UniProtKB/Swiss-Prot annotation:
Could be involved in insertion of integral membrane proteins into the membrane. The keyword Cell inner membrane applies. It is found in: Cell inner membrane. This is Putative membrane protein insertion efficiency factor. The keyword Ligase does not apply. Pfam families: YidD. It comes from Legionella pneumophila (strain Lens). One of its GO terms (cellular component) is plasma membrane. Keywords: Cell inner membrane, Cell membrane, Membrane.
Length: 81
């Protein structure tokens, strides 16, 4: 079961990594948060699993818009950067 979960996480994270390496460098940075939404999604999926990680990523993406205050929004609330 552990290998299947790991493989599923890697498959789900693949489009995020492709975005980070191929698309993100070509566009101007527009994420209102730090870490960026793609970094947040990748970390959430790897740490919490596919279902909870995707829900956390979708929640984050829904808050990232031009009218958002943005700022520092870590995956782990006690993380101080």
């Amino acid at each position: 079961m552990g290998k299947i979960n790991l493989m599923l996480r890697q498959i789900v994270c693949l489009p995020i990594k492709m975005y980070q390496y191929f698309i993100s460098p070509l566009i101007t940075p527009c994420c209102r948060y730090y870490p960026s939404c793609s970094e947040y999604a990748d970390s959430a999926i790897k740490h919490y699993g596919v279902i909870k990680g995707l829900l956390m990523a979708l929640n984050r993406l829904s808050r990232c818009h031009p009218w958002s205050k943005g700022g520092y929004d870590p995956l782990f609330p006690n993380d101080k950067n």
